[in-house]
Amino acid sequence: MATITNNPDKEKALNLVLNQIERSFGKGSIMRLGDAARMRVETIPSGALTLDLALGGGLPKGRVIEIYGPESSGKTTLALHAIAEVQKAGGVAAFVDAEHALDPTYSEVLGVDIHNLLVAQPDTGESALEIVDQLVRSAAVDIVVVDSVAALVPRAEIEGEMGDNQVGLQARLMSKALRKIAGNIGKSGCVVIFLNQLRQKIGVTYGSPEVTTGGTALKFYASVRLDIRRIQTLKKGSEGEYGIRAKVKVAKNKVAPPFRIAEFDIIFGKGISQMGCMIDMAEHTDVITRKGAWYSYNGENIAQGRDNAVKYLEENLDVAAIIEKQVREKLDIASLSFAGSGNDDEEEFEAVEAEE
């Protein structure tokens, strides 16, 4: 064990108190950071390669994550893709459906193993957060998604009258619950994702009027906060709308540089376009080149137009695997367990506050 001080008496006293703390509170309760076997934060894939790179490798394990944005922006879709990725790796996933709006058919299309997905539909916010805490403490679950914070209604509000003015109940509930969850989540390595909605503050002249629900506790306890927005509706000739283009701003990141931007397509009925992410990053790293509407790989034209390029990769998975490997090497992310790719666009979103 490395020494902290050159004074032998101090070192002896320090080792004595460290041993005493470990006897009282358990092995690993205190340690020199340099002695830790694994200091790098492990990650799980988000389901979008562009977002994985923006996050520094993926969603960090043992952390609280908040995904917020307007309605129909892709929050639940992104969370379900993360669940699918965990299940593909042999992990256990849980979905706390406070909104009572989970669609099993759509979840299955995204790759979620609905037969082994743990689902809870609690009636009160207290019940939902207690379920989350127990799942985290079990250390048997790899990811828990709460949909959503706005639907975590305190018991006192449910049992009260519609006209009762109960200020700050949900904020106090979230603050108390997160204090408990945060203490256990690091030990279990579980990823806890809270989906959150946006509200508008009245009378705001300067700055963004948007606020997230549930008070400010989640803002502080979350290691990663993702602001997801719909920026474009995808249309194809006479077929009409077939998807959306989503942009995610990493508004907060304690484990990698924040404020990065990622974009990806969400296809209606299919979810996030993995090959679309691949095309974007391959073009960004010059693995695939584009001249006009033509995309070429290794000097040969492979498709005309982005949609056809995506279709080409979907039909030639062996080529897609080679391109993915080359993209990872170009971005120097080959060593990451769940490597992804992203967009370093520095466009700023306005800061979103939290509603009390």
Curated annotation (Swiss-Prot):
Q: Name the positions where ATP binds.
A: G69, P70, E71, S72, S73, G74, K75, T76
Q: Show the InterPro entries listed in the entry.
A: AAA+_ATPase, DNA_recomb/repair_RecA, DNA_recomb/repair_RecA_CS, P-loop_NTPase, RecA-like_C, RecA-like_N, RecA_ATP-bd, RecA_C_sf
Give yes or no: UniProt keyword Repressor: no
Q: Print the keywords alphabetically.
A: ATP-binding, Cytoplasm, DNA damage, DNA recombination, DNA repair, DNA-binding, Nucleotide-binding, SOS response
Instruction: Return one Gene Ontology term, BP aspect.
Output: SOS response
Keyword check for DNA damage, yes or no: yes
Where does it reside?
Cytoplasm
SUPFAM superfamilies attached to this UniProt entry: P-loop containing nucleoside triphosphate hydrolases, RecA protein, C-terminal domain
Q: Which one of the record's GO molecular function terms can you name?
A: ATP hydrolysis activity
Entry's PROSITE patterns? Answer: RECA_1, RECA_2, RECA_3
State a GO cellular component annotated for this protein.
Answer: cytosol
Which CDD domains does the UniProt record give? RecA (cd00983)
Q: Please name the NCBIfam families in this protein's record.
A: tigrfam_recA (TIGR02012)
What family is this?
Answer: Belongs to the RecA family.
Q: What this chain does, per the record?
A: Can catalyze the hydrolysis of ATP in the presence of single-stranded DNA, the ATP-dependent uptake of single-stranded DNA by duplex DNA, and the ATP-dependent hybridization of homologous single-stranded DNAs. It interacts with LexA causing its activation and leading to its autocatalytic cleavage.
- Annotated protein name in UniProt: Protein RecA
Organism expressing this protein natively: Gloeothece citriformis (strain PCC 7424) (Cyanothece sp. (strain PCC 7424))
